[in-house]
Amino acid sequence: MLEKITKKRICLDTKLTIVSFTFDDAPLSSFTLAGEILEKHGFRGTYYVSAGLLEKTTEVGKIVSLGTIVEYRQRGHEIANHTYGHINSENCDPIDLIQNIQENKKKFDGIISSSFSYPYGAVNSAARFAARICTTSARGISSGINRGIINPMDLRAVRIYNRLGIKNCLDMVSDCATHGGWLIFYTHDVCDNPSSYGCTPEQFNNLVQTVVSKNLTVLTVQQVMERICM
């Protein structure tokens, strides 16, 4: 039954060539370094934030304060939902997940969008059901470009991780430019000595420059959803 409920699909225009840059957990470096790189080109990113992590130090570095989040929202970046407690969506009851998403939304009242990403990339039918109740899109970590018929509750994305290099990311940009689609990138920290889940400023800048050179449109996740659902 849950599979039927969560299978609402959207058909993407084959002419779309769009890129979204997204960041999970809100480490400070993803704002002050990656955010600045995006802004130099007039771009904005989507930041999936968990209120329960604010100002803590995690494996991806120091997490930002509420003040920084408000500042970057005012600068045009999208602040999106990542649950209040950064909980594993796959291991909890759908009702608990809905409550956790709503609690996070309340904490960031007035500045948070209806976009969501699954912490740890953990997603199943129950998690998609919960996400559909209170969000308009949910990004996972299944690799690939979104094209053709897509499930907005399980958006594909491509990771930008230093330990993997960025060749695959650059190849994906070329693929999107040639064959169309919506290419979503995700990472965590962006610093000279990144975690296993982050990348360096040089890698991120090179990727952004490649997107620019291919004349791809860069939008936040919310902006894309508004466009394709019109």
Model-derived features: positions:
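C-terminal domain-boundary segment and adjacent tail
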Residues: 2-13, 45-46, 51, 55-56, ...
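Generic enzyme active-site microenvironment
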Residues: 20-23, 80, 186-187, 218
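Conserved beta-strand->loop/alpha-helix structural units within folded catalytic cores of enzymes
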Residues: 23-25, 29-31
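Amphipathic, non-transmembrane alpha-helical secondary structure
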Residues: 31-40, 66, 70, 74, ...
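Short N-terminal helix/helix-N-cap motif within the alpha/beta-hydrolase-1
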Residues: 31-32, 125-126, 195
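Metal-dependent polysaccharide deacetylase catalytic core of the NodB/CE4 family, i.e.
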Residues: 39-136, 141-142, 148-156, 180-192
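Active-site glycine- and acidic-residue-rich loops that bind
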Residues: 58-60, 160-167, 198
